[in-house]
Amino acid sequence: MAALALVFQSCSKKSRSDLGATLFKKTNNKVFKDATPEGLAEVFKKVLAEEKSHVNNPNLINAYYEANDYDPAFVMDHIFNGDVDVTATYFSKAGEHGLDPKMFNADQINALVAKFKDKKAIKNLDEAYRDIALLEITTANSLINYSNALQYGILSPRKIYQRYYTATKRPDSAGMSRIFYIKDMRHFLDSIQPKDPQYLSLQKALKDGTTAPGISKEETTRYLVVNLERLRWKNKPTQAKYAIVNIPDYRLDVMDNGKSILDMKVCVGEGRNTDKTESLVDYDESDKIDRPFDRETPQLNSMIHSVQVNPVWNIPQSIASKEIMVEAAKDPYYLSNKNIDVYENGKKIEDPETLDFANAPKDKYEFKQRPGDDNALGKIKFLFNNKSSVYLHDTPAKAAFDKSMRAVSHGCVRLGNPDGFAKVVFGEGSTYDKISQAMTEDNPDPTTIGVPGKLPIYITYITCWTDSTGTIQFRPDVYGLDVVLYGHLQRFLASNDQIAKL
């Protein structure tokens, strides 16, 4: 609370000694003649305490009014010039953003404003004080909620997704406090409307009641709602050049100054909803809980710092125990045919054919696949720091790129055109030529090469967007993350419907 007080300390206003006379002049209601700042402050404190549980940011709101002697800025400066009416109008159109207008209390604000404009509506001084306090609190709370929703999204993706590692800015006290110093409501509200062309396109589709081919109108609407929320999150690339993978689209683009300079198919991790049994139309309360499969590719952002040409595959223990050891138990020559070496306590075992994999503990051995045509990572992998130990890589399993559903990997991203990606990462020149040559060698040695300048990489999850022709694209919710997001949105909107009832 002390920290919040510092936010408002330098902006503290003087108490309005002419409060009663000013309100009487503007309302023609004699009740206001006896209103004083001191009398208002006493009631205001009580109303704030009563409504604390009904407000999203009670500490921030309380800190402002405490620092400003409970000065009713919205009532005094914004009711009688029509500003608050404008605000309520914007709130009432929140459905155009896929949001519930009830969150922003437009009806309550209009009802309170109407009482101030009707000289007989407010009957006594206590009612006047309470209505001033309620209108101040309601307007402040709704402006903060509306501003946060449009600029940052309603939900924090980090709180709803277990595998979300993308830097995402969330609202802070300094930003939220801006609403107390608005001079022109319409100008402020216009300034916070999302202006991204993708957002405007999906917003128009929602307003027009668009129905996607093969999808019901209800499901289409929910597609639009969840992807509008994603577009409001402040997690978008800020660099001029970056690589971006969209998991549901199974594609990678390299963007440079807003244009795609390379586009390719990719394969991503196997997902929980590849059979499409979960949908946005048919879900229940438990669907809001994110239960990712072990193989799902995470959402993240990082920097590609190096490549390994002709890599050695250090096979993860989960894959080794569930797949490699099972196959080796069936066929003693499986490991040698796949160029896989076996290690125990860091020491290479020379005759793995003699080992009893069927009865060995799952974590007894380590497995490494040597470079070559059969290596699961192909001829090159692109490395970037991340908590999930995933990377981009080549693959010998090219047939998967001919399929429409390409959520087939163990979690890493397989590239349809690794050579083209290497060329974009390094540019034409001796380094790329060296890499390209090494990828064709018959008996290669693994080589690590640093990426000069590094390349930002974003792995995202977008199921609905507008393509370059203006056509809205829809993709199946392969990981069920739309269902999770929609479930949380519904719960949040329902809880805030109760908060709105001041």
Where in the sequence are the language-model features?
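Sec-dependent N-terminal signal peptides
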Residues: M1-L4
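Cationic-aromatic interfacial patches
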Residues: S12-R163
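C-terminal motif of bacterial Sec signal peptides marking the signal peptidase cleavage site
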Residues: V7-S10
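Well-ordered beta-sheet/strand-loop patches within structured domains
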Residues: S12-L60, E66, I144-N145, Y161-P171, ...
